[in-house]
Regions:
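Bacterial N-terminal signal peptides
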Residues: 1-6
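Boundary at the C-terminal end of the N-terminal hydrophobic targeting segment
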Residues: 9-11
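Glycan-processing catalytic domains of CAZymes
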Residues: 13-397
Length: 397
């Protein structure tokens, strides 16, 4: 009876009014995760010309303002870490916190006024991140920490004029930083669950506050393929960042981890909606990784899908030859073939990605060439965890 009544009401409602054109599925734009060094004047000029989004450290306010002056359309986000406080030189100056922090809460501020915000293990020791000296895990599940972090960061964004925040370490597991079990939890799984739930709360509190102020929140979401719905939930404000995009997993299968679980499906839905940013990073040690990263990003083509290759130190701005490919606009959705290969046709070319562990024979559309202008055979052997990026050949007269 209730179902029938609901259907009657729904049927009487007018069709939704379309107020604007559908978002254009454009080839990936470029962005710069510029947190490894102070940008030089020529890098700032380059960034203003080439990048849609730039992320800088909190103390780079002059660079941020220059970017806005050179290109008012570029989005400049400030780097802030959700999960740690830090006491290495630069984050602290002697026995006090620096004026501009890579985190939301300063080390000495927490040490002197809220020491309970430092997470401790079952031996009551503070948790320092392995491989990252003087990075200390914080109690992201504590409502008081969450509020203090959000209040401080939102105030700084508004005061300095940033477009928003890139919130790092929105992670799913502590294991990449420490083997510690957090006090009050029974095991590593319990610790991870506590952290995930805490970060859910931090995201909501900070995201709501920034959104109300007309500012952006883009978290760096990791391991979202392990938890269905996590990417969609954590990209719901201004988008999300994926720092290990298009790379092979470490499980020994040789497959691309990006395509596992529900993450890629959620990213496709976000890109198709076209309302928020997908900021994708591929750490490239070879041409193959660069090719796979770009082609995988092209499968997610949309008005706010940006990709970059990078070195883990993030000291330099990067540009890829694939970003000069001029793929144009996608003319179809990304298609998954029975073989497991994904393909997508663009107005200026075609991409194919093989995320599987087996080679696959693919048939590209006619009239394509490599980026070097070389002719392409009717069929191509696409190796495992590899990709093709092909462009339209010269028009026949």
């Amino acid at each position: 009876m209730l179902l029938s009544s609901a259907c009657t009401v729904s049927a009487s409602e007018p069709d939704p009014i379309i107020t604007g054109p559908a978002p254009k599925p454009l080839a990936p734009c470029a962005w710069w995760y510029g947190i490894g060094d102070t940008p030089s004047p020529w890098e700032i000029k380059l960034a203003a010309r080439h990048y849609d989004v730039v992320v800088l450290n909190a103390w780079e306010t002059a660079a941020m303002r220059k970017l806005h002056e050179l290109n008012p359309k570029v989005k400049v986000l400030v780097y802030k870490d959700f999960s740690s406080t830090r006491n290495y030189p630069g984050a602290v100056e002697g026995d006090r916190d620096a004026q501009y922090l890579p985190t939301g809460i300063g080390y000495f501020a927490a040490e002197r006024t809220q020491p309970e915000w430092f997470a401790i293990d079952t031996l009551k020791q503070r948790i320092e991140w392995r491989g990252y000296p003087k990075h200390w895990q914080m109690t992201v599940w504590d409502p008081a920490y969450q509020k203090a972090w959000a209040d401080a960061v939102v105030a700084e964004v508004l005061r300095e004029g940033w477009d928003g925040v890139l919130a790092d370490n929105d992670f799913s597991s502590l294991k990449y930083y420490s083997s510690a079990v957090i006090a009050g939890t029974a095991d590593a799984a319990g610790s991870d669950r506590l952290l995930r739930e805490g970060l859910d709360g931090m995201l909501a509190l900070t995201g709501d506050a920034l959104e109300k102020s007309g500012k952006m929140l883009v978290p760096n979401v990791s391991e979202s393929q392990l938890t269905p719905g996590r990417w969609a939930a954590h990209s719901r404000y201004a988008g999300a960042m994926e720092e290990n995009f298009g790379l092979r997993g470490d499980d020994g299968t040789g497959e691309l981890i990006t395509f596992k679980g529900n993450q890629f499906k959620e990213q496709r839905a976000q890109a198709a909606l076209g309302e928020s940013w997908l900021l994708l990073v591929t750490h490239t040690k070879s041409d193959k990784e660069e090719r796979v990263g770009y082609a995988s990003a092209a499968l997610l083509a949309g008005p706010h899908t940006c990709w970059t290759r990078a070195h883990p130190d993030y000291k330099n701005p990067y540009w890829s030859m694939y970003q000069d490919a001029r793929l144009g606009e996608a003319v179809e959705t990304a298609n998954r073939l029975p073989s497991g290969v994904w393909t997508r046709r663009f107005s200026g070319g075609w991409v194919a990605v093989n995320p599987t562990k087996l080679s696959v024979l693919v048939t590209p559309p006619p009239g394509l060439v490599t980026l070097r202008g070389e002719a392409v055979p009717a069929q191509l052997d696409l190796p495992p965890a590899d990709a093709f990026v092909l462009v339209n050949g010269p028009k026949q007269r």
